[in-house]
Structures are given as structure tokens and as C-alpha cells.
């Protein structure tokens, strides 16, 4: 473990790792992880932590045996536990001479461009001061997070943060070694996949078949997070947080867990904001021909390739693109409103004028305003 290979790292610590499956925070485990992070900062690495555990801390504080299922009471536990969680981190980092800061985010905070940039500037300023920021979703107001909605888990939040600050590495620490060729609890001969260059449908099926729930997420959400982060030019590693000095080993370039290779194309700030998917107003479903033209040939989206639109959006809004099976392809700024897209979907370019009195050009979304995930 000589030096480190990364200047800026986001480390996601999940509930299963922090509690050891007991439902209570494992202070010894947390102390060891914080010690590794402190050692990393002394090597000049900037670190942000995305930490679960607020509800577990609140449950322990209130002496509850079981976690209630109703959302309002989970929010109460999150409110109680968040201060406890921050206090633990403060106690663990203080002996190393490090100050901690709390960063509570919601989807709405980052959904507009100014909020995205403000959050980015704050996190960068904290890193410049040498402060360890502990990020979590604001469970008290973000109902989607506790109900495990699509973008409401800390795997995806960690990818958002990595996207936001242009991290070099997103390290997702959990209680298994990484992604396997089969569920290792059912197939003893399952092999660890050490490197992933592309997240394919086959990999997604492997993740969906995993029996390990890993807190509120699971391997499916970890693949979603890896897709967003790697598309943003960030290296991603999923690894077992129980391995001795795992953070220091991975930061120095040692091989552990499953590594997801980043896209060769480094998106700019505007493209990264679009990639976050937080500002979308609707969805445009496109056919396989359009998917191929966009993904393989870097073409614009034309009306002929559109199958349907969902949601209400206007010209200039950001929309999600998905294929005929509902799989996300990317995001783009639309030249047409949802009403107009419904009118011209499937039409060839020379037919648009017969439907719309004044059209906005042949492209529904121009290639320059489109990012592929």
C-alpha cells in the first residue's frame, strides 16, 4: 500500500456494513473505517462519505427491537438518529485531527441547475478545507428514500455525489466481495467478476437474481449507481468492507472486489447535471433503430424513431430516453413539447410540416443536447 492512485474519492458505507446485520451501529467497524479514511487524507486524497445508518442509530437511541414499517415513524427515527450518527463520526474522526460536516440532500435540491451548482461548490469548498463531509439523503422530508423509490437509495445518491464533484473513484463498500457469475449463496462454484467494461443485460440479470438484499439497495441498485458514475467518467469498485485495510488497498491500486471501468468520454458539467436524471420532465420511448443510431453512431433523435412520450414537458425541457422495453438510454433537451411529440412520433422529417404549422427542425433531440448512460 504505497501512496494512492486517486485524488478524489466518494466512499459509500451501507447499513449492512455499518450494523453487521444486527440493526445497531457497529462502533468498532466504524472506527476502523474512519481510521482508514483518516490515513487516506494524510496521503493527500479528498474524501466524501455517503453514509447510511440514521434509522438504525435512531432505533438504538429509542431502544426499539424492531424497525417499524410505516414511513412517518421511520422519518422520526431518521430525525433522531441523524444527530447520533454525526456525533459518532465526530468522535471517531476527532482523534485524527479531522472535522466533519453534515450534508443532507434531496432530489429537489439538485433538480435545477443552480441548486446543483450550489451543492457542488459547497462540497468542493469543504474538501478544500480538509473537512470530511458525511452525506445522506434527507430522510425527514424525502419520503421516496424510505419507501425505496427508484432514485431513493444511497447507492444512487453516492453516484450522484461522485458525478457532482467529479470524483476519480466511487467506492461502494458492502458485506460481499462484489458481483458474481451466479448467486454465491446458492452456487458455491460462482466466480467473482473482477472487472466490468460494460454493464450488459446479462449482468443486470445476474444482479436481479442475487438473494443478498444488502440493506435498502441490493446489487441491482449498485449496478444502476455504477452505470451513472462510469458514464460520468468515474471509476467504480464494489468491495467487501470487512477486508482489513480495504479502503487503503483499493486507493493504492490493489485488486479487490468488482471494478467498473469509466467511460472514455469525460462529460462536461452541463452533461453531468443532465446525467443525474433529477431534472427530467418526461420520457420519450424510442425504437431499436433509433437506439442503435444514438448509441453506436452518435446520431440525433428524429421523429421517425419515437414510439411514444410520457409525462408533460415543454420545448427546452430535459427528458429521459428509454428503449421499447423501458430500459434507460440517456437524457436530452427536447426541441418539441410532449403534445407535439405525440403528433409527430413515427413520422419522417418531410412529413412533420403536414402535421405542425411551424416545426422546430428535424431533430426531436439534437446530438449536442443528448447524453447516453
UniProtKB/Swiss-Prot annotation:
The main place the protein resides is cytoplasm
Q: Name one Pfam family in it.
A: AA_kinase
Q: Pathway involvement?
A: Amino-acid biosynthesis; L-proline biosynthesis; L-glutamate 5-semialdehyde from L-glutamate: step 1/2
Report if keyword Cell inner membrane is assigned: no
Against CDD domains, the record matches this protein to: AAK_G5K_ProB, PUA_G5K
Spell out the SMART domains in the cross-references.
Answer: PUA (SM00359)
- UniProt protein name: Glutamate 5-kinase
What species was this sequence derived from?
A: Dehalococcoides mccartyi (strain ATCC BAA-2266 / KCTC 15142 / 195)
